[in-house]
């Protein structure tokens, strides 16, 4: 039996995780799960730092990932990777699947600029102050990952090159 594969894009808000995820799907046919859609449903009127919300959202994400892997051999999803619930979810998924993490690198000012110019319909709406707090925490946590993608003004072609190298190592090995 083939081991199902999970790729997790980890990085600050505005680093390009969603865009890179769509490239995984469009170019490499690796299903990109928009977990932020699930988070928006779970959020209701709660603060994004609400412990019950955070716990519930990662439970919903893990359940959704597991469901998706019933139909797909490989999936990719994104996270800032900040909470203990994220860490717990990763450990749980690693027990049953091959899981690789990719750090998306982008400078703080560039992330904020991207957030201000992107469509908000697919993202949880947060203030500049919240974005800065979240991104500062992401940079401080500095999660160790299996791979890195530099998205500081990378062109689509440069991103595809970086993704292709990772796909060769993760999916086709």
Stretches found by the model and what they are:
Residues 9:
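Hydrophobic anchor at the beta1->P-loop junction of P-loop NTPases
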Residues 56-96:
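Glycine-rich phosphate-binding loop used to anchor ATP phosphates in small-molecule kinases
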Residues 121-162:
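Small-molecule kinase domains that catalyze NTP-dependent phosphoryl transfer to phosphate-bearing small molecules
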Residues 18:
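Walker A/P-loop
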Residues 15:
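ATP-binding Walker
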Residues 12:
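P-loop (Walker A) phosphate-binding loop of NTP-binding proteins
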Residues 22-70:
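Conserved substrate/cofactor phosphate-moiety recognition/catalytic segment
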Residues 95-115:
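Conserved phosphate-donor/acceptor-positioning beta-strand/loop module used by diverse small-molecule
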């Amino acid at each position: 039996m083939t081991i199902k594969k999970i790729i997790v894009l980890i990085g600050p808000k505005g680093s390009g995780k969603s865009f890179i995820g769509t490239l995984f799907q469009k170019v490499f046919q690796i299903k990109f799960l928009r977990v932020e859609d699930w988070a928006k449903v779970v959020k209701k009127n709660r603060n994004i730092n609400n412990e019950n919300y955070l716990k519930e959202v990662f439970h919903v994400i893990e359940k959704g990932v597991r469901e998706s892997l019933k139909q797909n051999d490989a999936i990719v999803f994104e996270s800032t990777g900040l909470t203990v619930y994220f860490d717990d979810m990763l450990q749980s998924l690693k027990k049953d699947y091959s899981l690789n993490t990719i750090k998306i690198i982008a400078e703080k000012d560039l992330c904020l600029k991207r957030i201000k110019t992107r469509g908000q319909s697919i993202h949880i709406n947060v203030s500049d102050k919240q974005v800065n707090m979240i991104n500062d925490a992401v940079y401080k946590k500095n999660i160790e990952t299996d791979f890195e993608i530099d998205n500081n003004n990378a062109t689509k072609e440069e991103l595809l090159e970086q993704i292709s190298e990772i796909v060769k190592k993760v999916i086709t090995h």
